[in-house]
């Protein structure tokens, strides 16, 4: 039986991939890579062509197989697939440690760096070699054999733990449901949420309305449902997912997993000669040292706190006056905030949905990139995908060259991980014959699917999410760097990687852009002037409270990784409490366990890096302010952003690229102005 994962040419053959193909393919490809490495190292001297290129080619075979496997694990999870995926994690971890500690490889890279030929390399080639040498150091190349062995054990165990953490969050999210037959208990809920809940119940052969902890089901209850007891019940279930508390206490508990992850991260950092895990994290980031990050977060907290307190005081005063409510619990905040927002601005998310049908939003997004970057998006049909709802598009430039392509998977489904993300399917590289391999991305969201004969209708918030992920997508797809390790998002420091994504969100708040991004699904009329003005006025409603919530995550993550000591009790919840006392205006509840479902921090790339969202937002707000000065559709400014930032991938330091685009270092003012925080 031939294995579809071996030596994939072109796009992944999704319909042919079965769980039983996975482990044999990965084992074979790892072995092939090991052989190629040993083979090239036998040469008397090393050049780019005889050393880097064959390694890159073999590495490509492995990543082309692993990318669809990893993607399917996120979008079409099943017990068989999950087992096959997890069986590969230790193999990949062991292989990557073997590479990272391979003295012969390290010496070969060093020889290239010190060769006369190095001076003739392109900026991207030099950067790829320098990054590789740095990564050898971070993989313990300089350690004794015993310490190297321990490093390998830690990395393998961490990869296992983060997969277990994710599985627990997914299982806990899917492991709770609430079925309600009496519609009177759902007063206030918008029609779209009722229809979705009814459809969900029918799909399970149940009567009434079925609610789950998936965001499209959970958020409408928290925002609109008059039934406070139901809001509390759902909040309780959501805030205690995968923990020792709540309705499924102890069932998918991440408590011990977090402890072990933190203990191992600290050990790893110390093994490599760092004082803290934050220092290890920043070794590959734009920020220079932990103090700089803490100062940045604390400075932003100081500037936002008073306004956040004022926003909460205004909400409380409104609740007391209008509803006689004097105490606000956490499950009341979204509900009463929505009421106050409607009172102040006569607008709600649900009213806007009919103006953001899927086809209009997608065509508006494509119109925008045509105007600013002169890039066309064209749908391609007949592509093999993992679900019938998935679409595929090519991005084409003014010379009619296909620059990149992407899969678009917009709707929430069972066995699909929550949230929204962009991931790379294929990276750009120059092939041995001189041809260019074009990049391909996965763009994944979790929006409500079309119901009945209505198209999918998005909230404005969801529109912003789509633009955000598309920003990551164009960073990957429009790169002109041909060296895989620094092409697209590869090699981009984590605290700069959110620059293009947050940058793209800005147009969702511009009248001239909303004129073609919005259009009523029945009449095709764009968003009426009065609704548009209300939307823009409401943009900064509770802006400081929102920034403070981001700071709470950022400071919790960074402080925990900066101060964690193995064996000391209760550090996770104590750190969270200390951070909340400092920055939060909304008091938490004793039983809430947000860290236990914080996949970004414990199962994603944001360990001691969650601050990156706000850090990059300073860059993106300031970058957009150049468009505000020169015209938001100015093609010259657009070309400058494309040429100086998007096409360059990770080939140069982000600060160098930013200064080239902006003409100076980034300033905090634009962010505060965009957020409506008094400067």
Describe each region flagged by the PLM.
Residues 1-33, 74-77, 81-288, 303, ...:
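His/Asp/Glu-rich acidic catalytic environments and adjacent acidic regulatory segments
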Residues 30-120, 550-560, 564-581, 585-588, ...:
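C-terminal non-catalytic alpha-helical accessory regions
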Residues 1-21, 28, 46, 188, ...:
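C-terminal, non-catalytic "cap/extension" segments appended to globular domains
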Residues 60-71, 134, 236, 333-341, ...:
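Short, hydrophobic/amphipathic alpha-helical patches that form generic packing surfaces
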Residues 124, 128-130, 157-160, 167, ...:
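Active-site-proximal, well-structured secondary-structure segments within enzyme catalytic domains
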Residues 50, 85-89, 253, 296-300, ...:
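Membrane-interfacial loop-to-helix junctions in multi-pass inner-membrane proteins
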Residues 14-26, 47-52, 250-254, 293-297, ...:
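Membrane-entry segments of alpha-helical transmembrane domains in multi-pass membrane proteins
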Residues 448-467:
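Short pre-active-site segment immediately N-terminal to the catalytic Zn-binding motif
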């Amino acid at each position: 039986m031939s294995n579809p994962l071996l030596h994939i040419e072109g796009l992944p053959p999704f319909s042919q991939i079965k769980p039983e193909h996975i482990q044999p393919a990965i084992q074979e490809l790892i072995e092939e890579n090991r052989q190629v490495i040993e083979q090239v190292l036998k040469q008397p001297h090393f050049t780019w062509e005889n050393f880097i290129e064959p390694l890159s080619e073999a590495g490509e075979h492995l990543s082309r197989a692993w990318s669809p496997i990893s993607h399917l694990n996120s979008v079409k999870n099943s017990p068989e697939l999950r087992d096959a995926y997890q069986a590969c994690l230790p193999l990949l971890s062991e292989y990557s440690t073997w590479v990272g500690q391979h003295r012969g490889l390290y010496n070969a890279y060093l020889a290239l760096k010190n060769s006369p030929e190095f001076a003739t390399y392109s900026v991207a080639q030099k950067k790829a070699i320098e990054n590789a040498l740095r990564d050898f150091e971070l993989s313990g190349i300089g350690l004794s054999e015993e310490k190297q062995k321990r490093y390998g054990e830690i990395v393998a165990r961490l990869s296992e733990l983060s997969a277990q953490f994710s599985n627990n969050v997914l299982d806990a999210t899917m492991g709770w449901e609430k079925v309600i037959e009496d519609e009177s208990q759902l007063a206030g809920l918008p029609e779209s949420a009722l229809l979705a809940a009814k459809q969900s119940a029918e799909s399970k052969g149940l009567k009434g309305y079925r609610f789950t902890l998936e965001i499209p089901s959970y958020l409408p209850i928290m925002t609109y449902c008059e039934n406070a007891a139901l809001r509390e019940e759902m909040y309780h279930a959501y805030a205690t997912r995968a923990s020792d508390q709540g309705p499924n206490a102890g069932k998918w508990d991440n408590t011990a997993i977090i402890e072990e992850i933190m203990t191992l991260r600290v050990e790893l950092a110390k093994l490599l000669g760092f004082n803290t895990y934050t220092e290890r994290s920043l070794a590959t980031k734009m920020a220079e040292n932990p103090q700089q990050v803490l100062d940045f977060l604390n400075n932003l907290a100081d500037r936002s706190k008073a306004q956040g307190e004022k926003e909460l005081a205004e909400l409380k005063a409104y609740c007391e006056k209008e509803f006689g409510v004097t105490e606000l619990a956490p499950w009341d905040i979204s509900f009463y905030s929505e009421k106050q927002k409607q009172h102040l601005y006569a607008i709600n998310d649900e009213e806007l949905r009919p103006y953001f049908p899927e086809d209009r939003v997608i065509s508006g997004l494509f119109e925008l990139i045509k105007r600013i970057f002169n890039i066309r998006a064209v749908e391609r049909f007949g592509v093999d995908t993992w679900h019938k709802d998935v679409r595929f598009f090519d991005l084409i430039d003014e010379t009619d060259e296909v620059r990149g392509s992407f899969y678009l998977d917009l709707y929430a489904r069972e066995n699909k991980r929550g949230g929204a993300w962009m991931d790379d399917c294929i990276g750009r590289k120059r092939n041995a014959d001189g041809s260019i391999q074009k990049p391909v991305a996965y763009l994944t969201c979790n929006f409500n699917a079309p119901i009945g004969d209505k198209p999918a209708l998005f909230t404005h918030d969801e529109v912003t999410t789509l633009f955000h992920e598309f920003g990551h997508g164009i960073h990957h797809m429009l790169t002109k760097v041909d060296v895989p390790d620094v092409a697209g998002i590869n090699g981009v420091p984590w605290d700069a990687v959110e620059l293009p994504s947050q940058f793209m969100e800005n147009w969702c708040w511009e009248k001239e852009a909303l004129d073609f991004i919005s259009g009523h699904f029945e009449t095709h009329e764009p968003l009426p002037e009065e609704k548009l003005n209300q939307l823009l006025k409401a943009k900064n409603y509770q802006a400081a409270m929102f920034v403070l919530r981001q700071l709470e995550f950022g400071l919790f993550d960074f402080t925990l990784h900066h101060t964690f000591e193995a064996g000391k009790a209760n550090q996770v919840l104590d750190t969270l409490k200390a951070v909340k006392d400092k920055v939060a205006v909304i008091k938490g509840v004793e039983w809430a366990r947000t860290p236990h479902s914080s996949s970004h921090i414990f199962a994603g790339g944001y360990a001691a890096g969650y601050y990156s969202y706000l850090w990059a937002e300073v860059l993106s707000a300031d970058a957009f302010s150049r468009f505000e000065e020169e015209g938001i559709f100015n093609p010259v400014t657009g070309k400058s952003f494309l040429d100086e930032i998007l096409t360059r991938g990770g080939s140069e330091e982000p600060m160098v690229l930013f200064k080239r685009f902006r003409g100076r270092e980034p300033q905090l003012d634009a962010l505060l102005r965009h957020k409506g925080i008094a400067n």
